[in-house]
Amino acid sequence: MLRNSDIKMDFNFLWLILAIFVGTYVVLFGFLRRVNDWYYVSRLGEKRHSLPPGEMGWPLLGNMLSFIRAFRTSDPDTFIYNLVDRYGRTGIYKSHLFWSPSIVVCTPETCKTVLMDNERFGRGNPESTKELLGKKTLGLSNEEHKRLRKLTTNPFRGDKALTMYVGYIEDIVIDLLDEWAGMNKHLVFLTEMRKLAFKVIGHIVFGTTSDHLLELMEKYYTDLLLGLRSPAINIPGFAFYRALKARKLLVKLLQDVLDERKKLSGIEQQKGKKGMIDLLIEAEDENGKKLEDDNIIDLLIINLLAGHESSAHASMWAVLYLYQHPEMLQKAKEEQEEIIKRRPSTQKGLTLEEIKQMEYLSKIIDETMRRTSLFIPIFREAKTDAKIQGYTVPKGWQVLVWTRGVHMDPEVYSNPKEFDPSRWDNHAPKPGSYIPFGGGPWICSGADLTKLEIYIFLHYFLLNYKLELLNPKCPVAYLPVPRPSDNCVAKVVKLK
């Protein structure tokens, strides 16, 4: 039989063990939470006192767990809201995200400062993005990059360039909508939209190429996209491993196309079928030196990626938002019917002038881009120690322009979670408050083409088709980009 003294001794021993366990946990927890601060902040010396508010998170992981947790809920904006609640509305915070020490900017003023100042803030990307899109090309000097950017921008910009593409985009949209409706079954709408957009950008990049080749490339891009923001861990089972394999297959395909195009370039020029690839093959610097194949392939990979993801996702979301708001759907449809009524009876197909008359559809597209904020963040890197609103941004730290933080800020847009095209009535957004395509010297060169594709797709869809969703209440997944978790399984039905 146990005596009271034995029971008391055992009880005290258990308390001692528990106290040691809790104490060890607290000390270890506190130590681990301070490692990043000691490693990244303390080494800055006196500059550390003028860093923005915030915390550096866990070793290696930083604040990625908080980021992922927020973006796996139904309200990803809690990530920024939590920073504002804890540290005040400074518009700039220190953190450790995407595997690097970071400064997050999320107000129009701070975003504008970073995007417009190319002297202090240059291009910056996670290591995984550099590996997958091409370190050699992403690491070019500013002057060389400007020269190449001009080459790759010219095919996308200006009325003359866009007018050339209207008819081609129309043909693709009309044919594929008719094909989808003819299937008379549910399909993965987002996947089909990505294929549509890839056909368009493929035509612009290559001038002409086989549908089979474009379909193969589009499949590789699916894996490539999933690895862009993931940790650069090249081990089977990780997204980066699959993405790197996809890049190698893409490089091989593009090298074959490049070799073939070099042989045929003279003939193609005579036919007038010139794509971006031909401009890159012909490009020379001031010393007459041509681009190496590696550079050309990297530029093709970057432009093919940028040229189809935005338009595919935005077109899908525009349709979904309109179906959630029947009165907006009807108003948008009536505008398209009016455009048809006003055109001469001899005219076939859309013109760029008609597209410019789509005022309500323009507001729908702008609101779709704001509400979805497809790609966050925009990556920059501090080229030198810089000051923003009195806070220090250390040289070498990545600067994350949090587009969603601006687009979903109730002080910038009233009721930001509401889809409301009327907010664009007679509204000119102030600099830094509407940045779906970035801003400054590195603004997305394909922004005009992206919107052109969306206009043309919505025009024909609204007039002739409807969407029957398999899962109307499907939850939204926000990583890597916002989309219905089933990728919008739906049936495209031709209107009678």
Swiss-Prot record:
The chain crosses the membrane at residues 11-31. Its cofactor is heme. Pathway: Secondary metabolite biosynthesis; terpenoid biosynthesis. Its EC number is 1.14.14.-. Pfam families: p450. It is an enzyme of class 1 (oxidoreductase). It is a single-pass membrane protein. It comes from the Eukaryota. It catalyses: melianol + reduced [NADPH--hemoprotein reductase] + O2 = 7,8-epoxymelianol + oxidized [NADPH--hemoprotein reductase] + H2O + H(+). GO terms for molecular function: ent-kaurenoic acid monooxygenase activity; heme binding; iron ion binding. Heme binds at residue 444. InterPro entries: Cyt_P450 (IPR001128), Cyt_P450_E_grp-I (IPR002401), Cyt_P450_sf (IPR036396). It is found in: Membrane. GO terms for biological process: brassinosteroid biosynthetic process; brassinosteroid homeostasis; sterol metabolic process. Monooxygenase involved in the biosynthesis of glabretanes, limonoids and quassinoids triterpene natural products such as ailanthone, chaparrinone, glaucarubinone and amarolide, allelopathic degraded triterpene lactones inhibiting the growth of other plants, and possessing antimalarial, antifeedant, insecticidal, anti-inflammatory and anticancer activities. Catalyzes the epoxidation of melianol to produce 7,8-epoxymelianol. Belongs to the cytochrome P450 family. This is 7,8-epoxymelianol synthase CYP88A154. The lineage of its organism: Eukaryota, Viridiplantae, Streptophyta, Embryophyta, Tracheophyta.
